[in-house]
């Protein structure tokens, strides 16, 4: 199969009488309701459920092994290879399946807010609510947006099409397959809308570094003086919450590029976790869930259609998708200068990492490569309670290239622009998961504010004797004892045991990196 066939197949789908291209939000909402794909909530949002798959399915994600890219990809459990022949067979089946649908929905937009680096995308959906999701999450073209001569990356999404592992070369009925040569993503067997978003992110994580742009799984905001802050962390660690600040303008909540000019959002919307969401704790997100927004797997009252964000009947991984314009204080376009502060967020299930610490450059590289956090319930299938994990660059599931490519780029950027780096634990305090409690959000906000506003630049610090981290002794609005983990534990022997255990876990994990990273480990790793 060559690119001409692909182009003809796509054109045949787009030209079908039942294909709806670039429908407005109200028309998509009408289609969703008429097709019984979702219901309206009391605030006017659409609520849809996703069946068995309420999170990503990482074991079903593949990259096509192609001559132009196979020597660049970091093959393994994250980036599983699949043959060109298997892709071609599935592609033909998916196109045939989509042609037989009563209706198809197409969105044409972009990934990348900086026009110099943006990538055109075409999303073909079996579901109208998936198309609304794509319209709200990716960048919507406006009249002034110049057309791109670049060939679009196309998503063909067929949730009700199920693969046959024996004949199709997949691991299950579900598949998410990326072909870089054919600039096509096939998604089938799962109704979880997040697969579309993360597939495009994976593509950008392959393409942007080729242009000397660091692609990052982070949120970003900017202060009144133009000072930019980045927040790295996996799902549920607080990226979206902590970057939605009343005093700072949001650049984006999840995916960014860092070019020679500064930072830009890859997306045009937000995909916020909304388990236990409240107007009091997260007013910006709460308010954003209005007409045109999509609620995923959120429980509604049968009569009033009011959302119950505390009810996890479907999953703990409940989500809200909405365009970034729903947030009051945003930067438009979603572009800003170079970061002055970088925050690594982790949810430490053992409760032994300090709630905030200042990192040297070597420590920043070490913790970026380590990407320690806890998998939180429901962000992937099969995970029902927190468990310790290391996710390289705080985004390992989405990184096609070897880790050192991204780490070296980050180190270079820190050197060039003098960004200060902090490690913030939004996980547990006073004990590990099950005995301790989750960090107080107000305390975390106060610590982050002090870090990004430069209040910790000359603060008095002590050095943790296990992890070598530099811990501030005082931060306004935070009790002093909270800042030092050992002081929050009743059982000091248990604290020492857990802290040493975690330090050893860091060391064991770091063995997977080449000896070239030994200097980073010596200067940036635990002291024990």
UniProtKB/Swiss-Prot annotation:
This is Phosphoenolpyruvate carboxykinase (ATP). Pathway: Carbohydrate biosynthesis; gluconeogenesis. Pfam families: PEPCK_ATP. Its EC number is 4.1.1.49. It comes from the Bacteria. Mn(2+) binds at residues 198, 217, 254. GO terms for biological process: gluconeogenesis. Belongs to the phosphoenolpyruvate carboxykinase (ATP) family. Involved in the gluconeogenesis. Catalyzes the conversion of oxaloacetate (OAA) to phosphoenolpyruvate (PEP) through direct phosphoryl transfer between the nucleoside triphosphate and OAA. Binds 1 Mn(2+) ion per subunit. It is found in: Cytoplasm. It catalyses: oxaloacetate + ATP = phosphoenolpyruvate + ADP + CO2. Keywords: ATP-binding, Cytoplasm, Decarboxylase, Gluconeogenesis, Lyase, Manganese, Metal-binding, Nucleotide-binding. Substrate binds at residues 56, 192, 198, 319. GO terms for cellular component: cytosol. Its main location: cytoplasm. Its cofactor is Mn(2+). InterPro entries: PEP_carboxykinase_ATP, PEP_carboxykinase_C, PEP_carboxykinase_N. ATP binds at residues 198, 217, 233-241, 282, 319, 444. It is an enzyme of class 4 (lyase). SUPFAM superfamilies: PEP carboxykinase N-terminal domain, PEP carboxykinase-like. GO terms for molecular function: ATP binding; metal ion binding; phosphoenolpyruvate carboxykinase (ATP) activity.
């Amino acid at each position: 199969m060559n690119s001409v066939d692909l182009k003809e197949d796509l054109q045949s789908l787009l030209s079908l009488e039942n294909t709806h291209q670039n429908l407005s939000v109200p028309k998509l909402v009408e289609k969703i309701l008429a097709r019984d794909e979702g219901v309206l909530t009391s605030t006017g949002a659409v609520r849809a459920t996703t069946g068995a798959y309420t999170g990503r399915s990482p074991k079903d994600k593949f990259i096509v092994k192609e001559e132009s890219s196979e020597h660049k990809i970091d093959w393994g459990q994250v980036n599983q290879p699949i043959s060109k022949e298997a892709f071609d067979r599935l592609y033909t089946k998916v196109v045939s399946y989509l042609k037989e649908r009563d209706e198809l929905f197409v969105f044409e937009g972009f990934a990348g807010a900086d026009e110099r680096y943006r990538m055109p995308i075409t999303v073909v959906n079996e579901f109208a609510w998936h198309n609304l999701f794509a319209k709200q999450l990716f960048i919507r073209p406006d009249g002034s947006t110049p057309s791109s001569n670049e060939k679009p990356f196309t998503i063909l999404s067929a949730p009700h099409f199920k693969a046959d592992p024996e004949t199709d070369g997949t691991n299950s009925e579900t598949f998410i397959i990326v072909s870089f040569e054919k600039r096509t993503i096939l998604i089938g067997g799962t109704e979880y809308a997040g697969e579309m978003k993360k597939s495009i992110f994976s593509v950008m994580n392959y393409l942007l570094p080729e242009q000397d742009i660091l692609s990052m799984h982070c949120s970003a905001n900017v202060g009144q003086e133009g000072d930019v802050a980045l927040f790295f962390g996996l799902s549920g660690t607080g990226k979206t919450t902590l970057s939605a600040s009343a005093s700072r303008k949001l650049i984006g909540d999840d995916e960014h590029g860092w070019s020679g000019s500064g930072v830009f959002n890859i997306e045009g919307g937000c995909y916020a976790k909304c388990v236990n969401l409240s107007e009091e704790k997260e007013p910006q997100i709460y308010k954003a869930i209005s007409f045109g927004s999509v609620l995923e797997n959120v429980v509604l009252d049968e009569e009033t259609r009011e959302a119950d964000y505390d009810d996890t009947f479907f999953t703990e991984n409940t989500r809200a998708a909405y365009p970034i314009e729903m947030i009051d204080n945003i930067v438009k376009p979603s572009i800003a200068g170079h970061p002055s502060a970088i925050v690594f967020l982790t949810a430490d299930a053992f409760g032994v990492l300090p709630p905030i610490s200042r990192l040297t450059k070597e420590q920043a590289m070490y913790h970026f490569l380590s990407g320690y956090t806890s998998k939180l319930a429901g962000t992937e299938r099969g995970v029902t309670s927190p468990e310790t994990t290391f996710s390289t660059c705080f985004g390992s599931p989405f990184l096609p290239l070897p880790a050192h490519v991204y780490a070296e780029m980050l180190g270079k950027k820190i050197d060039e622009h003098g960004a200060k780096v902090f490690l913030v634990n939004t996980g547990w305090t006073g004990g590990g998961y099950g005995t301790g409690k989750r960090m107080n959000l107000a305390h975390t906000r106060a610590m982050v504010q002090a870090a990004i506003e430069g209040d910790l630049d000359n603060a008095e610090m002590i050095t943790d004797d296990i992890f070598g981290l530099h811990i501030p002794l005082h931060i306004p609005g935070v009790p002093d004892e909270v800042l030092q983990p050992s002081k929050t534990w009743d059982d000091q022997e248990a604290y020492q045991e857990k802290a040493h255990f975690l330090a050893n876990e860091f060391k064991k994990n770091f063995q997977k990196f080449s000896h070239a990273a030994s200097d980073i480990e010596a200067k940036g790793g635990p002291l024990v």
